[in-house]
């Protein structure tokens, strides 16, 4: 097994967040686990596109696939990811002057 540095781990996390669809997907999974078809509809993405993003997030270790019979449910790999996303989102909304002021109350943006 290859050992990675803290910088490499953070770079992988940054790569996961660098795409708006992946970021929205992580935020959706922060709320609840989901199935690919439902997540694609929620995000307005094609199933193929969503599948590619889920593969990326799995490769980064942020998301896991849980087989359920003939379906697969996706969820965050660790509860700490949810807390990290909450903290990161709160920080970014606090310091970014372009952030939507209604995001925290309305769950938009």
Model-derived segments and spans:
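Alpha-helical residues within the helix-turn-helix
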Residues: 41, 58-59
């Amino acid at each position: 097994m290859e050992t990675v540095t803290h910088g490499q781990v953070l770079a992988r996390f940054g790569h996961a967040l660098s795409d708006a669809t992946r970021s929205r997907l992580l935020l959706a999974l922060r709320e609840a686990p989901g199935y690919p078809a439902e997540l694609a509809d929620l995000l307005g993405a094609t199933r193929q596109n969503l599948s590619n993003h889920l593969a990326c997030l799995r490769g980064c270790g942020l998301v896991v696939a849980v087989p359920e019979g003939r379906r697969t449910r996706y969820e965050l790999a660790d509860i700490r990811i949810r807390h990290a996303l909450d903290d990161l989102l709160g920080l970014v909304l606090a310091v970014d002057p372009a952030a939507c002021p209604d995001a925290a109350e309305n769950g938009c943006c």
